[in-house]
Structures are given as C-alpha cells and as structure tokens.
Swiss-Prot record:
<protein>
    <recommendedName>
        <fullName>Protein SMALL AUXIN UP-REGULATED RNA 8</fullName>
    </recommendedName>
</protein>
<keyword id="KW-0341">Growth regulation</keyword>
<keyword id="KW-0217">Developmental protein</keyword>
<dbReference type="GO" id="GO:0009733">
    <property type="term" value="P:response to auxin"/>
</dbReference>
<dbReference type="InterPro" id="IPR003676">
    <property type="entry name" value="SAUR_fam"/>
</dbReference>
<dbReference type="GO" id="GO:0009737">
    <property type="term" value="P:response to abscisic acid"/>
</dbReference>
<dbReference type="Pfam" id="PF02519">
    <property type="entry name" value="Auxin_inducible"/>
</dbReference>
<comment type="function">
    <text>Provide a mechanistic link between auxin and plasma membrane H(+)-ATPases (PM H(+)-ATPases, e.g. AHA1 and AHA2), and triggers PM H(+)-ATPases activity by promoting phosphorylation of their C-terminal autoinhibitory domain as a result of PP2C-D subfamily of type 2C phosphatases inhibition, thus leading to the acidification of the apoplast and the facilitation of solutes and water uptake to drive cell expansion. Triggers plant growth probably by promoting cell elongation. Regulates branch angles and bending.</text>
</comment>
<comment type="similarity">
    <text>Belongs to the ARG7 family.</text>
</comment>
<dbReference type="GO" id="GO:0005886">
    <property type="term" value="C:plasma membrane"/>
</dbReference>
<keyword id="KW-0472">Membrane</keyword>
<keyword id="KW-1003">Cell membrane</keyword>
Amino acid sequence: MSILKKSTKLAQTAMLRQILKRCSSLGKKNGGGGYEEVDLPLDVPKGHFPVYVGHNRSRYIVPISFLTNLDFQCLLRRAEEEFGFDHDMGLTIPCDELFFQDLTSMIR
C-alpha cells in the first residue's frame, strides 16, 4: 500500500472515530467538566444517529453503517469543513435535501 493511500485511510479512520465518539456520547457537559447521562430521543434506534440536512435542517435518522460508505464520508468531510463537529447544533450535512435522499436510497 502506498504512503498516500495509508495517509488517506488514516485520515478517514480518524474522522470516523470522531463522529462515532460524538454520536455515542450524546451527553451534555455538567459543571464539573464531565458528562452527565442524557436519554437518547425515542425515535433514534440503536445503531443509528440523527443528521440535519439542507437549508431547512430537515432531520434524518441514518444507520451507523453509512459511515463506511465513501460517498457519505465525502458529505461528512464537507460538514466538518463548513461546521466542524464540536458544536451543539447536531450533525449538519451541507447539501441539497433531494441529493441526500437520493444518496441514502442508493446506499441502502
């Protein structure tokens, strides 16, 4: 494996870890700097996470398995560049809602 492929693979792995960590913690900081437990929304089944898409920030529940899809990873990189992952707005995907629906239906 070339060095370029290795470095790209490492960057993807780091990004996926950060997203999974963010999705799995879903807690809010308490005054002591730690996290307190917060119940997940009832409409988010185990193995899934919510994302917000488009200008209207429409909410979608997607399976964690999407994180391994290269096209979905591309959307996540765009989200990281535009919004970053360390904010309280939820994971926001900066793309047209129709495009997102088409992409996710192809992934499924």
